[in-house]
């Protein structure tokens, strides 16, 4: 699928999208929900068009400006397909958009978002036999090898142990495909701020000895969504010559069962020196993120920290149309996330910033535990609190934890993955 903007007014064969209902139109848009419904119906249109044409034109010149970014973002997200391993390819369709009401810069930004969101989803959808921690790390190196502002360091398993990344070590030790800890440093001249992006990179999650059910294990090769989003965001931002320094940290592991696997109630020393009781091996994402967060704070003194993870599925359970939930102590960042999300039709819900729940992390046999907290049915909140425990107090104000969805495949509600929101949030800094 290729997205192009056209400056030439389309003919009568175009699909007319409008916010005015008193004219002859194909799609009427007046709200967030109408955009969701439109993106679903457009899927069916595309199936027909692929059989009869090589392109499709959307005339959105009559669409209110407030809906333009949202409409374009959602239809491109909804039409995404991953067909790399299908031998009989579906004909690629060119999508032309006529939108004279927006500037060339806005169009350029939308193309950047759409292209890099697609590349991110392609990374997410790679199966675990094609994307091990090592191959993911190597692919990242190849992606940035021509960018002179980017340097990459890949910690292999022995170096992970040597650095004291005990929680990454504990999970990564379970597999014949050992862990990697990827550090990507985008460092433009005269940068004034440092932003750390941290992504959960579990290339396959069986749950380990806290093994998942058959149904729950499906699509767990996508548990590297957080790491993929971080890489995709840096690719997009570096191509715009973004002004601030960006550090991307990707702890990459397989969570599988073996003779070396971590077991329930084992105790492990984290990077920050705290001991952690591993009550639930299937709560591995928060473990590797905890080490990465502590590593970021100690080594880079960041002005902002954003972590991304398919951690608990809270966003999916709370509402079918939420792209992600998030935890932050910063009201301004929260307002920015909400406002940008409204502009791009990526809805989110803020997890309550109740820091007093830190005391519920206490273990009887270690400093903290990673699961089985006294506050039941609150995993989205408690996993956020667990992560905050590994961030020194002075860094907590400008930290946001994004609990995102497994949404890089074609789902029934065409949910967006939040890429546009994350990209524009960082651009504002």
Show which residues each predicted segment covers.
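A generic structural signal for tightly packed, nonpolar segments enriched in small/aliphatic residues
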Residues: 8-10, 134-429
């Amino acid at each position: 699928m290729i997205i192009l903007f056209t400056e030439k007014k389309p003919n009568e064969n175009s699909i007319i999208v409008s916010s005015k209902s008193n004219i002859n139109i194909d799609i009427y848009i007046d709200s967030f929900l109408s955009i969701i419904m439109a993106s679903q119906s457009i899927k069916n249109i595309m199936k027909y068009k692929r059989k009869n044409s090589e392109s499709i034109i959307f005339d959105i010149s009559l669409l209110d400006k407030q809906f333009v970014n949202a409409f374009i973002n959602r239809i491109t997200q909804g039409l995404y397909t991953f067909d790399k391993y299908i031998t009989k390819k579906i004909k690629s369709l060119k999508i032309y958009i006529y939108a004279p009401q927006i500037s060339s810069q806005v169009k350029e930004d939308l193309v950047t978002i759409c292209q890099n969101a697609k590349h991110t989803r392609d990374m997410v959808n790679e199966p675990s036999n094609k994307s091990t921690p090592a191959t993911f790390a190597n692919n990242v190196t190849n992606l940035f090898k021509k960018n002179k502002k980017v340097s990459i360091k890949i910690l292999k398993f022995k170096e992970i142990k040597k650095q004291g990344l005990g929680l990454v070590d504990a999970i990564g030790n379970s597999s014949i495909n050992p862990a990697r800890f990827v550090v990507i440093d985008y460092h433009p001249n005269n940068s004034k701020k440092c932003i750390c992006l941290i992504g959960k990179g579990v290339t396959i999650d069986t749950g380990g000895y806290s093994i998942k059910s058959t149904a729950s294990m499906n699509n767990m090769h996508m548990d590297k969504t957080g790491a993929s989003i971080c890489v995709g965001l840096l690719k997009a931002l570096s191509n715009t010559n973004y002004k601030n320094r960006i550090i991307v940290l990707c702890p990459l592991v397989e969570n599988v069962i073996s003779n070396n696997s971590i077991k329930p109630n084992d105790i492990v020393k984290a990077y920050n020196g705290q001991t952690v009781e591993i009550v639930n091996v299937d709560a591995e994402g928060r473990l590797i993120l905890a080490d990465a967060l502590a590593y970021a704070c100690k080594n880079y003194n960041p002005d902002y920290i954003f972590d991304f993870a398919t951690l608990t599925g809270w966003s999916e359970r709370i509402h079918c149309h939420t792209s992600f939930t998030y935890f932050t102590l910063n009201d301004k960042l929260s307002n920015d996330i909400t406002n940008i999300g409204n502009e791009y039709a990526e809805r989110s819900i803020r997890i309550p910033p109740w820091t007093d729940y830190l005391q519920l992390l206490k273990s009887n046999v270690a400093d903290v535990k990673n699961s089985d907290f006294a506050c039941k049915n609150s995993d989205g909140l408690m996993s956020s609190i667990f992560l905050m425990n590994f961030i020194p107090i002075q860094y907590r104000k400008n930290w946001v934890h994004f609990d995102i969805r497994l949404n890089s495949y074609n789902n029934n509600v065409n949910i967006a993955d939040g890429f546009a929101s994350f990209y524009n949030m960082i651009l504002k800094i």
